[in-house]
Amino acid sequence: MAIKRNQGHGLPPKRDPALGRDALTTSQALPEDQEQSANEDRIRPQRLGDYLGQKDLKEVLGIAIAAAKARREPLDHMLLYGPPGLGKTTMSLILAAEMGVNCKITAAPALERPRDISGLLVGLEAGDILFIDEIHRLNRMAEELLYPAMEDGRLDVTIGKGVSARTRSIPLKPFTLIGATTKVGALTSPLRDRFGLIQRLRFYEVDELIAIVHRSALILEQPITPEGALEIARRARGTPRIANRLLRRIRDYAQVKGYGEISQTVAATALDLYNVDALGLDWTDRLILETMLNHFGGGPVGLEAIAAATGEDSKTIEEVYEPYLLQIGFLNRTPRGRIVSAKARQHLGLIPVEQSTQLDFLP
């Protein structure tokens, strides 16, 4: 299986202004995730059986693979959605490996002109997979080129301009489009309706992350205790990408400090040093919560107001930080805006434990 990546896009990583470090707990891919490509390729599961977690998704895709192989057809077009870092790209590579085909990887922001996506489509061999990350960000022209490609296996190209313009149809080899998005509701209905499979990836449970940490540590030849793996899993925000990133940083710490293995104490001390607390919250998470409490009385407050007060981009707050804060019950979303929960106040040490239940019922 060949993996081809279409470059030319990406945003600079969010940095912790207090510590001057890349935020270890962001679920977005950081440069270090790309630079450590050799280790990343070793850690990344290659087959569906090696993929840990997402049990229901694996069963659905296993059936799709078996059926497509039996009919000697490409997989149906599919849409994978959910928070970043949960394995959407990895799953597309696994599907390509299981089907014995190539996988071309790109992202919607890189497909600015019609020829960008036309070149990718024409270059696909029979059965190949085209993976488009952030597919909700496709521009209108690129999206409209996909419609006949997905439905009828053809590429409609306009030649000329004005009254002399004409459309030429180019036949395409059968292929599978896999779209990935964190915002499935942002897709247009015509595009969304053309996917035969639409599947959601959920946050991982702690026991699933423990298994992932143990597997990665074994591949990296890094001794780790069960308690050390548990400590990493608890602080990984339900996200494998973050779990593996934390493992690499703790491995650095253990090596420099002369520890042979990663114990609970080593993991906790290292993560405290990197400003990742017991629930995986980092400097920016706490900034968001404390700003809402100090400036807006805990809410309700709108997203743009939070962004202005914290100096963070509103999309970054909504797509990177907010999903986990909602998942663990630290934020509530209401028609009037976001509200900091009593559980979050308790975690920040702002109210006694016995008051937390009562405050959750306040308007």
Curated annotation (Swiss-Prot):
Which reactions are catalysed by this chain? ATP + H2O = ADP + phosphate + H(+)
Q: Keyword Zinc, does the record have it?
A: no
- SUPFAM superfamilies, alphabetized: P-loop containing nucleoside triphosphate hydrolases, Winged helix' DNA-binding domain
Q: What is its EC number?
A: 3.6.4.-
UniProt-annotated stretches for the region Disordered: 1-44
User: What residues bind ATP, as annotated?
Assistant: 43-44, 85, 88-90, 194, 204, 241
Binding locations of Mg(2+): 89
- Name the Gene Ontology biological process terms: DNA recombination; DNA repair
Residues holding DNA: 333, 338
List the residue ranges of the region (Small ATPAse domain (RuvB-S)). 205-275
Recorded hits in Gene3D superfamilies, A to Z, give: 1.10.8.60, P-loop containing nucleotide triphosphate hydrolases, Winged helix-like DNA-binding domain superfamily/Winged helix DNA-binding domain
The UniProt keyword set, sorted, is: ATP-binding, Cytoplasm, DNA damage, DNA recombination, DNA repair, DNA-binding, Hydrolase, Nucleotide-binding
The entry's family comment says: Belongs to the RuvB family.
What UniProt notes about the protein's domains is:
Has 3 domains, the large (RuvB-L) and small ATPase (RuvB-S) domains and the C-terminal head (RuvB-H) domain. The head domain binds DNA, while the ATPase domains jointly bind ATP, ADP or are empty depending on the state of the subunit in the translocation cycle. During a single DNA translocation step the structure of each domain remains the same, but their relative positions change.
- The protein here is known as Holliday junction branch migration complex subunit RuvB
The organism's lineage is: Bacteria, Bacillati, Cyanobacteriota, Cyanophyceae, Oscillatoriophycideae
The gene that this protein is the product of is: ruvB
